[in-house]
Amino acid sequence: MDKQIEINVSDALTETPVRFRIGKRDFSIYPPTLGKTQILKKLYLELDINAGLLALNPLAETMRVCKEYPDIVCRIISYSTFADRKNLLNVEKVYQRAAFLKDNTSVEDLATILSVIFSSDKTEEFIKYFGIDADREQKARIGKIKGEGSSLTFGGKSIYGLLIDFACQRYGWTMDYVLWCISYVNLNMLFADAITTVYLTDEERRQFGKGGGTVVNADDPGNKDLVRKMISDYDG
């Protein structure tokens, strides 16, 4: 068990904000929702971030963008300190807070806060930690073995069908809730680790060397060895 990742998972699940102080004022960086992520996405594009340098030397690249684009950085931080849709869409309030940040912080302060925001999305880290990436590979291989049969699938080409529709259909949430009321990390983890069931036909069971008309839940950790054995038997 990786204690730090477990702590990160708990913080993500409970949507715990990161707090900081500027002068006598306290602020919180709230986990971004899907709606906030879309707002920030436009500002990130304006920063002209060098993804290669950010991966190689995140502190240096973060310092650079804070020096070159302080106004945009302060707006990003300002947006990140609001939690609800009403405040996020209140442009005047966002700009007022951004102006306060610019007048009361150094480049180093901005870089430190921006680094926290940049590193807030730990979805891929969680996916690897829980072995969900391995499940994805297994399901992809099983999909190839099973083939398409007589079914055709359409849609899921954009975030509307892939994530928003998934959440609304599965949990009965409104689009407004999906956009503004659940963190982007939690939303992505619900999608990535959703339980699915794979039904094996008689022919497929014959190919896998398994009989008995079993329905195999490929997302159940207890079935991982069985699924791997099925794939191994088929490949062998």
Residue ranges and their predicted role:
Residues 1-71, 75, 79-104, 108-206:
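An amphipathic, hydrophobic-aromatic interaction surface with interspersed Lys/Arg
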Residues 196-236:
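Alpha-helical oligomerization segments
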